[in-house]
Amino acid sequence: MTKDIMDAVFIKEMAKTTSNLYRLGWDERNGGNITYLLDEKEVVEYLDVKQIIRTIPMDFDGKKLAGKYFLVTGSGKYFKNVEEAPAVNLGVIQVSEDGKAVHLLWGYTDSGLPTSELPAHFMSHIARLSVDPENRVVMHCHATHLLAMTFTHELTEREFTRTLWQMCTECLVVFPEGVGIIPWLVPGTNEIGEATSEKMKENRLIVWPHHGIYGAGKSMDETFGLIETAEKAAEVYTIVMSQGGIKQAITDEQLKALGERFGVEAKAGYLIN
């Protein structure tokens, strides 16, 4: 007999994270989406994986993820409602063997669907798993100050990254590889998914200009913390600029010393020798 899925750690983690994202104002209305790669062992504790509720076609070749299980936020769902009604706003899905569809095993009880950004998420999972087999989470949100920076700051990866590194001491330690930036593209398309996943091969943070940010990590906490750290730096930058601009900041020599102390190396070419 399977356990009650409402007691599953992965459901509780997702509910808590979506609530925090809404509380912080990073996922207004139905903005934002999360996909959480699950281990089969943890899924079968709560679900009979042979009991398929319905099959949902995809306009994307997901064969590289065939057979894998994911907990996914629903299309058009409000993050503020997840904690009170997980079964309506979330779904546990399995990618079909041919990669052309997903099987719904639990959730979306109002006949809902997975997030419209599923192709971008799945492409990002494929990219991250190719360089980090332990990657489990892809998270998209509209982090306010990072979003604002895309209107006022130079949109080159090196300069954007350097500014974030210089605003908070912990930034270099948390994301030494920097942030990736794609052009503005229509959301919910394979095109934006392909652009994002290409950047995901080298970065865990991808900025969507005038829209939001994508983050990836080994756990829900790691991924949330990654975005949270970059957003804090962007907030500090916003405050600094409103106070008259930068008069002093963390120097490149100090950033190098920081990297040496914490065993991380800044992306090649981003610091001045």
UniProtKB/Swiss-Prot annotation:
Keywords: Cytoplasm, Lyase, Metal-binding, Rhamnose metabolism, Zinc. It holds the Pfam family Aldolase_II. Gene3D superfamilies: Class II aldolase/adducin N-terminal domain. Its cofactor is Zn(2+). InterPro entries: Aldolase_class_II_sugar_metab (IPR050197), Aldolase_II/adducin_N (IPR001303), Aldolase_II/adducin_N_sf (IPR036409), Rhamnulose-1-P_Aldolase (IPR013447). Catalyzes the reversible cleavage of L-rhamnulose-1-phosphate to dihydroxyacetone phosphate (DHAP) and L-lactaldehyde. This is Rhamnulose-1-phosphate aldolase. It comes from Listeria monocytogenes serotype 4b (strain F2365). The lineage of its organism: Bacteria, Bacillati, Bacillota, Bacilli, Bacillales. The gene is rhaD.
